[in-house]
């Protein structure tokens, strides 16, 4: 994934940053699904099986694809809007891809909800893993990956992890 994204984004500065940010967003999505299923397994006896692994692989593909769509628009706008700040370019790119990302995700979510409520019991956990992963993937491709990219571009990467000081009243 890192190699493909670095090759695809070779015309922008620091193409490996795009790949690393996409991988971090993808790991976020996988960890969200695994974490929720760990809680479900502990409290409700939900077991991990081959369908769960299939759902994780599908979530990975969806997450990376959605992130690449956002990053591709950032790349296009960098070439078109030369001279604007990187934050402005990312903001414009997010606004341009937001409707597409939400519409794609909602289409998948409605289909998965129909499968969850009207499908067989054997695929309920598979569909639930997909639902959690698609929601997490949509969120992370829009917000997490872009924030990481902007923070890294501004060399302010560690600011994300710092806690804000409380203001005096």
Region roles according to the model:
Residues 3-4, 8, 32, 36, ...:
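Alpha-helical membrane-inserting segments
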Residues 15-72:
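Hydrophobic transmembrane alpha-helices and their membrane-interface caps
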Residues 53-73, 99, 104-110, 139-145:
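Transmembrane alpha-helix detector for multi-pass membrane proteins
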Residues 8-12, 40-45, 118-120, 153:
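Short helix-capping/hinge motifs at transmembrane helix termini and TM-loop junctions
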Residues 22-28, 81-119, 128, 134, ...:
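Pore- and gate-forming transmembrane helices of large, multi-pass membrane proteins
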Residues 19, 34, 66-73, 77, ...:
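Membrane-spanning helices that line or support transport/gating and their immediate boundary helices
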Residues 91, 99, 118-169:
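Hydrophobic alpha-helical transmembrane segments of membrane transport and translocation systems
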Residues 1-32, 57, 105-117:
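Internal alpha-helical transmembrane segments of multipass membrane proteins
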């Amino acid at each position: 994934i890192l190699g493909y994204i670095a090759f695809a984004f070779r015309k922008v500065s620091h193409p490996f940053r795009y790949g690393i940010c996409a991988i971090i967003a993808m790991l976020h999505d996988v960890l969200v699904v695994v974490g929720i299923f760990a809680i479900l397994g502990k409290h409700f006896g939900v077991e991990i099986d081959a369908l769960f692994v299939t759902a994780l692989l599908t979530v990975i593909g969806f997450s990376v694809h959605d992130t690449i769509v956002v990053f591709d628009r950032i790349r296009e706008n960098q070439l078109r809007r030369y001279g604007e700040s990187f934050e402005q370019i990312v903001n414009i790119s997010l606004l341009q891809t937001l409707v597409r990302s939400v519409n794609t995700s909602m289409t998948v979510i409605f289909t998965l909800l129909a499968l969850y409520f009207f499908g067989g019991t054997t695929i309920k956990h598979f569909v639930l893993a997909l639902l959690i992963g698609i929601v997490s993937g949509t969120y992370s491709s829009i917000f997490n990956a872009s924030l990481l990219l902007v923070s890294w571009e501004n060399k302010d990467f560690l600011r994300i992890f710092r806690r804000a000081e409380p203001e005096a009243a």
